Amino acid sequence: MQKNDDLLRERRKDEHVALGVKQNEQLAPSSLKDIQLIGTSIPRYNVKDIDLTTTIFGKNVPFPFYINAMTGGSRHTKKINAELAEIAREVAIPMAVGSQSAALKNSSLIDTYNIVREINPNGMILANVSPEVAIQDGLQAIEMLEANALQIHINPAQELVMQEGDRSFSHWLTRIEEYVKLSPVPIVVKEVGFGMTRETVKTLADIGVQTVDLAGKGGTNFAQIENDRRRDQAYDFLLDWGISTGQALIDMQHQDAPKIAYLASGGIRNPLDIIKALALGADSVGMAGQIIYSLKKEGVTKTIEKLELWKEQLRGLFVLANAKNIAELKTTPLIVSGELAKWGTLREINLVKLANRK
């Protein structure tokens, strides 16, 4: 029985990658398209003046984007994690692994995850567990990678679509609180592409969580991935569940939103999406599907070159926004229009204040 469970988990990991890559072949418009930064025609800064340094988990990181959680737990995904770790090392950005449950249940799969530390010994690496994982096992996940931080992914929509997924969730908050108290490294609670509302973020802040990843809709769709894995595809009505990355970021502009650190991910396409998310308060911006898609289609070297180009393009965008660093960028005025403005208005966000901030 154990062997069958292990094979099922490994197959699921490989299917997640294959279906995720397929999704990224045809992308919908960015959920940040209705956000427009108000720039300048007479910049105060030169490109060389721009400082892209950000602070996450109490540490300075030279660039405000990272490789988000995606994979691990099979022979095939070991190779992918190794390549992602090489990219993270060369570009000098943080990296998260996918859920480590497979390795916690089958020690022969540990190397499919800790390969990232072997290849990137000095980088910022994030471990990853579900709130289903007991504390002692979660501590093993951290130790497995010598991780700098721990992602706890919350994914009820994905679990419900997954035939073998969890059906009990009421203990999650208590478990997360235990992690906050007992983890030797910082905790970040992340969605998996369904987005967090400000109410969810407040619930987490109230138990001591200091960082969340809003992880909105618009990128890899795990409801669709799990539905595609089902023979009956019985959950096709749930494929649009959740709030987008743009909506989640706008929601955090509400006057009652908790004042905790947040990251943004989900459907990030390019440096323009990155700067918009940073301007809306994110401390860093994560990508998973697009990086794996680039890795699969173009290889490690081309993906590194693309991300290095993004750094230079991002500096140029900061010049246009008249911001020397992320702190200044977060005071840059921006216009929210279209459907996103309608949504923000219904959520009682002061869009006029955003448009005229200084």
UniProtKB/Swiss-Prot annotation:
Disulfide bonds: none
Keyword Magnesium: yes
Cofactor: FMN; NADPH; Mg(2+)
HAMAP family: Idi_2
Cellular compartment(s): Cytoplasm
Subunit structure: Homooctamer. Dimer of tetramers.
GO biological process: isoprenoid biosynthetic process
Ranges in coiled-coil conformation: none
GO molecular function: FMN binding; isopentenyl-diphosphate delta-isomerase activity; magnesium ion binding; NADPH binding; oxidoreductase activity
Gene source species: Listeria monocytogenes serovar 1/2a (strain ATCC BAA-679 / EGD-e)
Binding site for substrate: 12-13, 158
Catalytic activity line of the entry: isopentenyl diphosphate = dimethylallyl diphosphate
Family affiliation: Belongs to the IPP isomerase type 2 family.
Main location: cytoplasm
Binding site for Mg(2+): 159
Name listed for the protein in its UniProt record: Isopentenyl-diphosphate delta-isomerase
Residues reported in the UniProt entry to bind FMN: 69-71, 99, 128, 190, 220, 267-269, 288-289
EC number of this enzyme: 5.3.3.2
Record has Oxidoreductase as a keyword: no
GO cellular component: cytoplasm
PANTHER family tied to this protein: ISOPENTENYL-DIPHOSPHATE DELTA-ISOMERASE
